[in-house]
Amino acid sequence: MSIAFNHTIVAARDKRESAEFLTELFDLPAPTSFGPFMVVTLDHGASLDYADVAESDEIRPQHYAFLVSEDEFDAIYGKISARGLPHWADPGASRPGQINTRDGGRGVYFRDPAGHAMEILTRPYGSGS
């Protein structure tokens, strides 16, 4: 049996702003409109489908982790730094401005415009030394 992740819905105050934030930061194709969503397509066909949430509704921050190459990490982290985006080496945000080196890779956490915890990492946790 072959099971693959296809899509998830990501709550946002401004779906276009949040989707474009990610595509610009990750150098992905521009988001596309599909029904009420702004769709960010990732490799292997998976997508993040951004949906607007009313101001009166709470957005519960979620965590989204993206496995990237070393070169992609350098490019994305360069944009994070150039934009002055707050970032951390850990999910608890206790190591601001730092990168983690877990399992022989690199990882960093930052927030998107809707407040979701985004993470880029070069090696899956538990995969190395």
Model-derived segments and their meaning:
Residues 28-62, 66-70, 103, 111, ...:
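Conserved short beta-strand elements that form part of the metal-binding/catalytic scaffold
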Residues 1-16, 63-64, 68, 123-129:
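N-terminal beta-strand motif that seeds the catalytic metal site of vicinal oxygen chelate
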Residues 16, 65-113, 117, 125:
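Vicinal oxygen chelate
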Residues 35-36, 93, 128:
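Residue-level "edge-of-site" marker
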Residues 7, 37, 107:
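Conserved beta-strand and immediately adjacent loop positions that scaffold enzyme active sites
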Residues 14-29:
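Amphipathic alpha-helical segments
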Residues 1-3, 59, 113:
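Structured loop/turn residues at beta-strand edges in well-structured enzyme cores
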